[in-house]
Amino acid sequence: MKDYQSIFFTNSFHYLRVPLTNHLSTKMKKIMLIFVLLWARWFPIIGQAVTTSPILPNSDQEITLIFDLTLAKDAKAKGLLGKTSDVYLWSGAGSTDTGDAFQFQPAGQTNFALPFEKGKMTSLGNDKWSIKLKPRDYYAVPANIPIKKLGVLLKSGDGKFQTEDFIIILYDNKLNVAFLQPKEKTFFADAGATISVLAVSSQKANLELTVNGVSVTTTVLKDSLKHTLNISTLSGASQTVKITATTATETATNEFIVTVKPTPTTAALPTGVKDGINYISDTKVTLVLFAPKKDFIYLIGDFNNWQSDNKSLMRRTPDGNRYWIDIEGLTKGTEYAFQYLVNGTLAVGDPYCEKILDPNNDRGISSTTYPNLKFLPDNVKSIASVLQTGQTNYPWKVTNFKRPAQDNLVIYEMHIRDFDKDGSYKNAIDRIAYFKNLGVNCIELMPISEFSNNDSWGYNPIYFLAPDKAYGTKDDLKKFIDLCHENGIAVVLDVVYNQADYEFPYVKMYWDGSQPSTDSPFFNQKATHPYSVFFDFNHESQATKDYVNRANEFWIKEYKVDGYRFDLAKGFTQKQSSDDGQFRLYDQGRIDILKDYYDKIRSYDKDAYVILELFSEDREEQTLTDMGMMVWANQNGDARNAVKGNGSDFSRFSYKPRGFKTPAAVGYMESHDEERIMFDALKTLNLSIALERSKAALAMFMTVPGPKMIWQFGELGYDVSIEQNGRTGRKPIRWEYFSDPERLKLYKVYSEIIKLKTSQEIFRTTDFIVDLAGVVKKMMLTNSTNKMISVANFDLAERSVASIFPSLGKWYDFFTGTELNVSDLTTKYTLKAGEFHIYTTTQLPKPEADLVPWKPLGTIIPLAVESEMEEGIKLYPNPSKDLIYVEIPAFAKGYIFLKINDVMGRLLSETEFKAGQKNYTIDIQRLPQGTYFLNAEQGEKRLVKKFVKL
């Protein structure tokens, strides 16, 4: 047969352009020209991202795979465009029609984040790539095992960019016949239209084309047949078109069905129904799909053998925006899979469904994680939704959970996949004592709604109301939330409303080749900001607002979640920006959008948390936190620098430098998105020192008033880079760390400081001072019954620190319980490198011994006081409201410096006076009320006098 091109699975239809490239040799150009001329014979039917030569490939012959990256739909494929090298095939072979297409993989194909040399692609120019392979040899499939299909994708060497998966069907060595035009097995056409038919066979044969059993044309000993087919004029009428190839010894057939586009009935929605699945009774449901600008929609599923006919044609509402249908005669408790067949060409699930079935990924979910998972029929090739009447409600044990106050939250950010061996809710349930002992009072789950594939961080959402089955059943999730509530732990969901991946029905339904169409009710054609990865929601669209509000209401009411973290909340805008400098500027439109969502959430649950990943300018965050929302406060870089002994500033762990009125900054040293502190520290420090310095960082971070967050396993000193196996790839699970004595001490220090924070009222005070910018960091908190100071030396050398304590009397070292009687506020204390302390004026229960190596403060170095400077010096009045007068001995010579410091040792003012004066006047009117120190200095001579500003 002729060297035709084969077209296989992809989700959209395009025309392929194959211009010659200047990068090819003259000989190669000639070969390509012949190839293109052969191709051009069937040019009108070409248009898929993957084609093959020959047209009907089999497993035992060499085939050429040709990729056109301009036609790939995965958003991550954009990173492959324009490349001339560093593109690789990642592929597999499957032995069954319905099983895993990656069942057999080539030797050496093990790490997606590394180049796979055997799969190195050849550039054809203009974003087209090719590779030649013989499937049976390439995938090392035994001769007695059939190869039914190939699963293929292209990726960059480091795996950061990739196409979606494509499926290539392989044929056996017998006579085969197929339609190249039309491509679809079933499709719709306008009444009275004509369509072109092109069939090819794997060898010369007698070919016959029939329509509804009636012969319309034949050829003799040819390998192709062309025909123009006249479509019926009857609405909804179907025609079965069949091609038969016959040789002296074999017969092969293939067919497609074309149906005349129907005209739907117009009818108003039944009272009380809403978009999605409406359960009317144990035997009846009403399905409603919001689908403006669509011509007709069929409901297909288990209940009608996946057939589109007049009975399954959905009614259209008078405004043309919705389609609906009643399904009756259902069996209580039975799961039914279904899809909407939109305009006769696109089958999608219900955007509001609570469960999906995915023919390409579900078989990769273990029966341990999700028992008795239903599978789709072999002929259903795309995601379907599930409905089930008469479901048994989960028996909640906790129905009136009292949430921790926002300013008292200690959040544990958690990724189910990388938390334990099976990556399931069941694993998390089994570890509840771990969370309880750690002391956290909130768990923030990285996205758990259905995302593309089974292995992901979850920021590629496709069905926003369906929990992803890769982690377990919906009741497993509910049990985990219920158990958290039993143990005083709130649960927050990380939700992704800035973008959706291609498999989201409302992306696919309004699609224009490689991007959302201009008439999409939900999506911008191009993202309005520089950080979008997939397809960008338009949050000014009412359709988007309605969908997001429904999703937020659903998770609160159905799963009793305690709130949300909005991923990339800065992206909730229609304001155009090309870089972060523009993107982060105050945006009233974004504020209005977020306020609307927040108000709706609080109408569903008056105490629900809303945390924003915003990172906009302070003025905007001030406005939103004034409304009651919280914002992420990333200090990862400073935390890593502090542990390593480099310059760092922890000041913005506090809400005060941000100008917030309330403690609404969720400070964190690590998150899913940041490099791990311990990995970075171990580049320059040994493990023992790095663990101790991590304790110091925790002490200075966690004791700042306001909500805090830690990333999973930071409490054990997790030291695997975020970039290992690709940024979002699976990471090794190190539960063995919990058995390591030194790492266990870090966990226990986390536990003690977290419990200190959540149990002591002093951490809710607004009366606190932070001095967190230097290598020695200090902080002081005060309330009516207690005072607390924390101090840490992040230098790599010993430091002497003055004015640690703000008041005289008894202070108690938290980790040793040792009492220190402070009798001189000017005392200097020596802190070793990495040493930290937490002191309180109220004695607290002492933690387990030896969690930290530091002895109580007490290595005292008295300040040098020269007798010549001391004689005759006076400071009055003391206390004072406005002015203080200082008398210095008349015989002092040179210059005298008078400095005022606060109780944290911070310099507030400095005045230089010429010696010889007897009296000096200092204005203190601008100082807040409190205790201060006047330092009189001349050369190496120094005298400190305490005074009080009224």
Name the predicted role of every residue range:
Residues M1-H23, F43, P862-Y876, S880-L950:
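C-terminal outer-membrane/trafficking sorting elements
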